[in-house]
Amino acid sequence: MKEGIHPKYEEATFTCASCSNEIKTRSTAGDLTLGICSECHPFYTGKHKLVDTAGRVERFRRKYGMQDQ
């Protein structure tokens, strides 16, 4: 392989924005923040849980005058 043309493959931490779970791995991308991970995603947990990291649900409810149930 040629020297100096490949990206650095180093330790990285992927952090979940929903549950603050940290996944240690190796990557060329560096540290990343994920919106949702396998620890809190409803498909993997089997639980229906509303994850709203950007306030979209509240904005929708205010816009259409909906109440929490």
Swiss-Prot record:
| SUPFAM superfamilies reported in the protein's UniProt record | L28p-like
**Source organism's superkingdom?**
Bacteria
Q: One Pfam family, please name it.
A: Ribosomal_L31
Q: Which GO terms describe its molecular function?
A: rRNA binding; structural constituent of ribosome
Name the InterPro entries for this protein: Ribosomal_bL28/bL31-like_sf, Ribosomal_bL31, Ribosomal_bL31_A, Ribosomal_bL31_sf
Q: Which UniProt keywords apply?
A: Ribonucleoprotein, Ribosomal protein, RNA-binding, rRNA-binding
Report if keyword Ribonucleoprotein is assigned.
Answer: yes
Disulfides per UniProt: none
An example GO CC term for this entry is: ribonucleoprotein complex
Could you give a single Gene Ontology term from the biological process aspect? Answer: translation
Belongs to which family? Belongs to the bacterial ribosomal protein bL31 family. Type A subfamily.
| NCBIfam families in UniProt | L31 (TIGR00105), PRK00019.1 (NF000612)
Matching HAMAP family: Ribosomal_bL31_1
Name the PANTHER family on file.
50S RIBOSOMAL PROTEIN L31, CHLOROPLASTIC, LARGE RIBOSOMAL SUBUNIT PROTEIN BL31A
Self-association or partners: how does it assemble? Part of the 50S ribosomal subunit.
**What's the stated role of this polypeptide?**
Binds the 23S rRNA.
- Name of protein: Large ribosomal subunit protein bL31
